[in-house]
Amino acid sequence: ADAGMYPGIRMFTVPRVSSQTPLQDCEAAWQTATSESVGQFSAVGYFFGRMLYKALGIPVGLITPNWGGSTIEAWMTVDAIDSTPGIDHAAAKSGTYDNSIPQRLYNGMLLPVCRFTAKGFIWYQGESNRRNWYDYKALQVSLVKLWRETWGDGKMPFYYTQLAPYRYEGDDLRSLPLVIEAQYRALAEI
C-alpha cells in the first residue's frame, strides 16, 4: 500500500534451500520496497524496516531467510546443538523434513548471507518447537551465540517477535504459551 513512500528500504529474500553442506552464495537480488515487492517479503521484516527507516532517516537493507514451519534446530549447527547444555540432544536432532533437520537451513540459507554487514536480527519462530518447548530457552541462547559468532559480533542485537496465539489441532493448549515463556526467559541470557 504505502511501500512506495519508502524508497530507502531494500529487501533481499533468501531462496528456500536445505543443504547438508555449507553454501557460500545464493541466487537472489536486492529489491526496492514497492507495493508489488513487499507482498512477497516478510511482513514482520518489512514493518520493522519501515519503522527503522522512519526513525533513523537512513537507507535500510532487510535480509529475510525464512521457512514457515521450521524448527530452531534447522537454523543451528549440529555442533551448537551438541554444546547446548541440559537439552534432550536426541530429540533436538530428530528432524525429518527439510525445514526441521538440524543445520540444513543454517547451511543453505544463513551462511550464504553472512558476508553481508548486519546490525541485528529479528526472530519470529517457535511454533514448530511446541513439542520440545522445555528445550527452547537453552536452544535459543545457543542460536543467538552461534549467529553472533557467525557475523563476528558478540553483541549484535537480537530481537524476537512474540508468537501469535493459535490453537494447533491435537495440541496441548499449554505448549505454545510455554514456548513464548521460554523465549522471554532466554532474553535474560542473550
Question: What are the functions of these language-model segments?
Answer:
Residues 1-190:
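Cell-envelope and extracellular/periplasmic
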